[in-house]
């Protein structure tokens, strides 16, 4: 058996991270790879397109019902979906209570101890990435995820999140084996999006693995709780996800330690591409009336 690849998809909330990851993993499964998805997002939507389900029961909620994690069996928490992809959701605490990261690491330890990682080619962690708090950085900190793919777009906040996630990877890169595999741009059809994605990848010292074009077939598939590969396998969009999966598959061992940039450098990059205009310091803090009078 080939060595296990532990990859993770990080990205700003709402960027299409879970959709991109599930379509990519479905394409890897089509290629004959054995996949385990470990959802680490409190929304517990990391497996819905694979399982055709609203939200999978999470390890934490099942453990709470059973008494403790020790009272669970692997078959209680693991579901098998499209192309025999195995699916688990770690879950998180109630909003405002506790740390989601603790749930993530509890879940990963439970899965490892109960043989979930046996006879698997890829374990994929789907992780919320707006906040690189200690909790959501768990798969990186604990040296579980070795290869990080950041899903982003040409929007400033998505690039800001990608840069922040890179800072988290850099922090743990030397103590563990974690590396940045590359950026995946999920097109939002903003100005100069491809140019910006490539420019950010260059600044971070990595590569733009793939530019996924926007297509309404993705939404049509999502409404049916399906991946594009299952819903419309002959579509051009399905082929884009297959191409992305091939790029990821061929990228093993090629990850880098990123070189994150400052907020000023990020803004300079946006100005260079004409997305942001330099701020006229003389107008900062002035009301509309004051500006009209000046």
From Swiss-Prot:
- Cofactor binding notes: Binds 1 [4Fe-4S] cluster per dimer.
Q: Which cofactor does it need?
A: [4Fe-4S] cluster
Which Pfam family, any one of them, does this sequence belong to? Fer4_NifH
Q: Is Membrane among the key words of this record?
A: no
Where on this chain does [4Fe-4S] cluster bind?
A: 99, 133
A GO molecular function held by the record = ATP binding
What is one process in the GO biological process aspect for this record? nitrogen fixation
Coiled-coil regions, chain positions: none
PTM summary from the entry reads: The reversible ADP-ribosylation of Arg-102 inactivates the nitrogenase reductase and regulates nitrogenase activity.
Q: What is its EC number?
A: 1.18.6.1
- Reactions this protein catalyses: N2 + 8 reduced [2Fe-2S]-[ferredoxin] + 16 ATP + 16 H2O = H2 + 8 oxidized [2Fe-2S]-[ferredoxin] + 2 NH4(+) + 16 ADP + 16 phosphate + 6 H(+)
What superkingdom does the record give? Bacteria
Q: Which residues bind ATP?
A: 11-18
ADP-ribosylarginine (modified residue): where? 102
Purpose of the protein: The key enzymatic reactions in nitrogen fixation are catalyzed by the nitrogenase complex, which has 2 components: the iron protein and the molybdenum-iron protein.
The entry's family comment says: Belongs to the NifH/BchL/ChlL family.
> Which PANTHER family does the entry mention?
LIGHT-INDEPENDENT PROTOCHLOROPHYLLIDE REDUCTASE IRON-SULFUR ATP-BINDING PROTEIN (PTHR42864:SF2)
Q: How does it assemble?
A: Homodimer.
Q: What is this protein called?
A: Nitrogenase iron protein
Origin species? Bradyrhizobium sp. (strain ANU 289)
């Amino acid at each position: 058996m080939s060595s296990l690849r532990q990859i993770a998809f990080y990205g700003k909330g709402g960027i299409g991270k879970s959709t991109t990851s599930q379509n990519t993993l479905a394409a890897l499964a089509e290629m004959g790879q054995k996949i385990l998805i470990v959802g680490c997002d409190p929304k517990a939507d990391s497996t819905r397109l694979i399982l055709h389900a609203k939200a999978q029961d999470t390890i934490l909620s099942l453990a709470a019902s059973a008494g403790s994690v020790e009272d669970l069996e692997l078959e209680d928490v693991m579901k098998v979906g499209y192309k025999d992809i195995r699916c688990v959701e770690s879950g998180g605490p109630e909003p405002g209570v506790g740390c989601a990261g603790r749930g993530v690491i509890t879940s990963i330890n439970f899965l490892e101890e109960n043989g979930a990682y046996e006879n698997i080619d890829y374990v994929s962690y789907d992780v919320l990435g707006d906040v690189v708090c200690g909790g959501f950085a768990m798969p990186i900190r604990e040296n579980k995820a070795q290869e990080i793919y950041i899903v982003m777009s040409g929007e400033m906040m998505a690039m800001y999140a990608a840069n922040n996630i890179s800072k988290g990877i850099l922090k743990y890169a030397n103590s563990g084996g974690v590396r940045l595999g590359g950026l995946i741009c999920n097109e939002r059809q903003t100005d100069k999006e491809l140019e910006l994605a490539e420019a950010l990848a260059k600044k971070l010292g990595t590569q733009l693995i793939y530019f996924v074009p926007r297509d309404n077939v993705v939404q049509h598939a999502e409404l049916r709780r399906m991946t594009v590969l299952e819903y419309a396998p002959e579509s051009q969009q399905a082929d884009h996800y297959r191409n992305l999966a091939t790029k990821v598959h061929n990228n093993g061992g090629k990850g880098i330690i990123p070189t994150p940039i400052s907020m000023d450098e990020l803004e300079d990059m946006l100005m260079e591409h004409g997305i942001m205009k330099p701020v006229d310091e003389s107008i900062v803090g002035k009301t509309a009336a004051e500006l009209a009078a000046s």
